């Protein structure tokens, strides 16, 4: 573990608890994987500088350690947070580029001897296991996700036009184009019987007349039919779907003469 003893010697005067010793080990492991320490805290400060040593005030808060790192080639930045919870330490690492997060929980009593904090040769227990857990739980997941993000191809899509993205656009029912369709207009009002005149042409109206599209004026339906009085103007809006109150064609003025029986219809001798 070349370099860890030198790092511990430089930080030994500030190490006063088990979590300090564990963060020192964690810092060394991150540095050996190609990173420089930048500083302490979430945000960059005026005293930030790339260094393999622990930054100033790295352990000012014994319950929450926040350290920032940058790879030697400047392509990756890490934000490391270590939270002390009773006899455990929860380590959380965020890689800014890929937003990949990894975390690891360590038991302080399993790896740190609190009785020998100033003795480098006795302070760390199971150091190989500790190193393996840091690498597999934090370093490797961060690097794998970062490499995967760089290898995946970036798909580029052409910019969408206003016609494509307008959700309120109503498609025309009969768009007028310069090129006319090869079929005839089925809505032509005078197409009745056209197929009989030109059997080899396109299909047109047959012998069944559509009363709504016959081309002749239609009688208006009186909405007041069946009522003693007429409805006031505007009671039925133009074009509204409306069922008359009574039979169509009746008039409140009285029956039509055609509706009366002929004179003497009941005289058998007439």
Curated annotation (Swiss-Prot):
The modification Asymmetric dimethylarginine is found at residue 218. One of its GO terms (molecular function) is protein heterodimerization activity. GO terms for cellular component: cytosol; endoplasmic reticulum; perinuclear region of cytoplasm; proteasome complex. Pfam families: PI31_Prot_C, PI31_Prot_N. Residues 254-264 have a biased composition (Pro residues). InterPro entries: PI31-like, PI31_Prot_C, PI31_Prot_N. This is Proteasome inhibitor PI31 subunit.
